[in-house]
């Protein structure tokens, strides 16, 4: 059953529009605070945010809710999402909160929740929180003497920087490397350039001047144009693109060519397999990862396990299988030797370590496999249940049969936007084009019929 407020990556929406309003955020703080206060000991919550203007509003609202429930709030300020997960553990907090909409534009925002172990909360706990949100909590709040307090914590970003630096093998330095890092005007604008510089690299930071509205604006992992231009301009060895909250990374090689998350996973998995660091003889990715990655890993005798989209599902599968590498083509890369969630900076450091240890260029290192042709289309919809219609289901089944066993068709509703994502993948491009175009028309047609039906019912 779909959850009421939580999507694939927490609660998300447009700032000052439900559910990203201050009154609702305060209710979330109350509900989460009441639940965790009753189960835990420290009653401590750490709260981080990215650089969106609305972060201030939501931070204050959440603090009001948490303190009303008797929780002590430690405010980290702008930090990457993985820093919240890491500091949640090191500060012995019961809960971690990240205020961010990740790679989305500045006008969106969201609330991500982490448990005391640094892992994102389970669906079961999120459902309990939703039930509490819809409950009158006035009798469950703290007494006057037990109201919590809020404290702004200074300097913890440097704890995260040191943590990230320690993930690099001791005998590896970045001396003489020219690195461009695109901070997306986001949460990693301090941490990423500083860590790379302290490790010896010559660093060129771009999009590192957030103003509240320029996060992810023609920059970062969703728009590599400015990074490619800078890599070419300064003749860099590598370009690193992070997203707004620092949990994704894409790479641009010295030829200004894009390296996506699938290729990065292949590089790390192959290197760790050779050096005996790969656990469980496999890797976890999502249904959106390229078939070429699966074929590459299979040739190495490694298994590829696919999950639904969302790094939380990747992490769940990694824990179940005992694997220490997982990720998504979009650049979420989870390395459980180091952390509990996607970490763009740490993943980039592991790629740089592979590059230094192999003494090869980034373009050579990151060409591990030839991607299978893949087409991705988004259909904006009004009816989120359009995929449940029998006619649509039948059309999807027929299209899947038409593609055959050596190709894939993945159609899913986005967990963060009102769109249906259609991905076709296979060796025969013409067939793919036809099938994907057909499915775009089918879904758009039946969504339009839903709108007509709804208007007739309301007339």
UniProtKB/Swiss-Prot annotation:
Pfam families: PGM_PMM_I, PGM_PMM_II, PGM_PMM_III, PGM_PMM_IV. One of its GO terms (cellular component) is cytosol. One of its GO terms (biological process) is peptidoglycan biosynthetic process. It is an enzyme of class 5 (isomerase). Mg(2+) binds at residues 102, 243, 245, 247. PROSITE patterns: PGM_PMM. Belongs to the phosphohexose mutase family. Catalyzes the conversion of glucosamine-6-phosphate to glucosamine-1-phosphate. This is Phosphoglucosamine mutase. It comes from Bartonella quintana (strain Toulouse) (Rochalimaea quintana).
């Amino acid at each position: 059953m779909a959850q009421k407020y939580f999507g694939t990556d927490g609660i998300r929406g447009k700032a000052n529009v439900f559910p990203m309003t201050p009154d609702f955020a305060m209710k979330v703080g109350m509900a989460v605070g009441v639940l965790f206060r009753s189960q835990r000991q420290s009653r401590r919550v750490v709260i981080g945010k990215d650089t969106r203007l609305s972060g201030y509003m939501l931070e204050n609202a959440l603090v009001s809710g948490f303190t009303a429930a008797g929780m002590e709030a430690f405010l980290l300020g702008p930090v990457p999402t993985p820093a919240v997960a890491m500091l949640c553990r090191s500060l012995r907090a019961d809960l971690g909160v990240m205020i961010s909409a990740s790679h989305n534009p500045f006008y969106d925002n969201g609330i991500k929740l982490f448990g005391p172990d640094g892992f994102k909360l389970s669906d079961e706990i999120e459902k309990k929180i939703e039930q509490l949100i819809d409950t009158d909590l006035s009798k469950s709040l703290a007494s006057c003497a037990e109201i919590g307090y809020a404290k702004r914590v200074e300097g913890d970003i440097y704890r995260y920087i040191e943590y990230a630096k320690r993930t690099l093998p001791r005998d590896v330095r970045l001396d003489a490397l020219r690195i461009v890092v695109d901070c997306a005007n986001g949460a990693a604008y301090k941490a990423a350039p500083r860590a790379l510089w302290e490790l010896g690299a010559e660093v060129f930071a771009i999009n590192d001047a957030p103003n509240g509205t320029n996060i992810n604006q023609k920059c970062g992992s969703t728009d590599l144009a400015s990074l490619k231009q800078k890599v070419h301009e300064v003749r860099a060895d590598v370009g690193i693109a992070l997203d707004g909250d620092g949990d994704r990374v894409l790479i641009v090689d010295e030829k200004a060519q894009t390296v996506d998350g699938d290729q990065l996973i292949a590089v790390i998995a192959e290197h760790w397999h050779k050096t005996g660091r790969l656990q469980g003889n496999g890797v976890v990715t999502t249904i959106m990862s390229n078939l070429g990655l699966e074929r590459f890993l299979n040739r190495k005798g490694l298994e590829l396990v696919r999950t639904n989209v969302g790094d939380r599902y990747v992490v769940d599968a990694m824990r179940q299988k005992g694997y220490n590498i997982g990720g998504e083509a979009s650049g979420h890369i989870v390395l459980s030797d180091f952390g509990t969630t996607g970490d763009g900076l740490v993943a980039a450091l592991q790629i740089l370590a592979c590059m230094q240890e192999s003494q090869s260029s980034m373009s050579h290192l990151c060409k591990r496999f030839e991607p299978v042709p893949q087409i991705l289309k988004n259909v904006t919809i009004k009816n989120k249940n359009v995929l449940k219609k029998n006619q649509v289901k039948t059309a999807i089944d027929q299209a899947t049969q038409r593609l055959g066993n050596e190709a894939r068709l993945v159609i899913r509703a986005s967990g963060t936007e009102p769109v249906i994502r259609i991905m076709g993948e296979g060796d025969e491009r013409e067939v793919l084009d036809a099938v994907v175009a057909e499915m775009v028309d089918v879904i758009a047609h039946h969504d339009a019929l839903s709108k007509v039906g709804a208007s007739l019912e309301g007339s």
